[in-house]
Amino acid sequence: MRQTTTTPAARSAITAAIVTLAGIVLSGPVSLALVNALHPQPPWTGPEAFARAYHPIQTLPYFTGFLLVGGAVYLVAALQTLAGDAHRVRATAGLAFASAFAALIAFNYVVQTTFVPALAANYSPESAPLIAAFSLSNPRALGWALEMWGYGALGVATWMVAPVLADHGRAGRTAAALFVANGPVSIAGALLTALRPGWVMTPAGLGLFAAWNLLMLVMVALVIAAFRLSADARCISRSARE
């Protein structure tokens, strides 16, 4: 039986959505604005130039990105718990894809916050290939493959758990539609990265990155609205019966 919007799982979904929302805002516009204002990293020309321009504040988007990762997995887990029998298997598959997302992105952010900074701070010609391979400043780095395929896995996860939201009012139905849309959008981004490495740092890639951030913001905001409005409606109905 599907759990109601007043269960701990529903409250967890709201909390997870708030954490995810904070992660999107802090790791995206807030962190990027601070980095660009204080110590921007110039366009990639090579590992040596990257090391010269490196500053610890450039890791801020990745540290705050852990909020997004944790919040997103927590949200999918909460929705899987709320799934009724008809959607339980699908939602459980979504949780598995969310776990794959977390593994890929968390590994990438550990590399960006710990491994790459150590290489840049103690730069030597021997470390140049590793910086080029992993730093997200390099549009053709392995880091971008991890990033895009990781978020592709999250897209599959949101696609899978979307039906859980559909019976939580208008906000829930809209959120479900956006959760579904995030699936092919994220998968397309991963495939494009495989076919055209480096596209993420082109004007089109940066524009799509901004659009995806907006999509994610609206998605998680609607989750908060859906569960809060649904819970309020249940409280009003209960009061009326009393």
Enumerate the predicted regions with their spans.
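Hydrophobic, aromatic-enriched alpha-helical segments typical of multi-pass transmembrane helices
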Residues: R2-E242
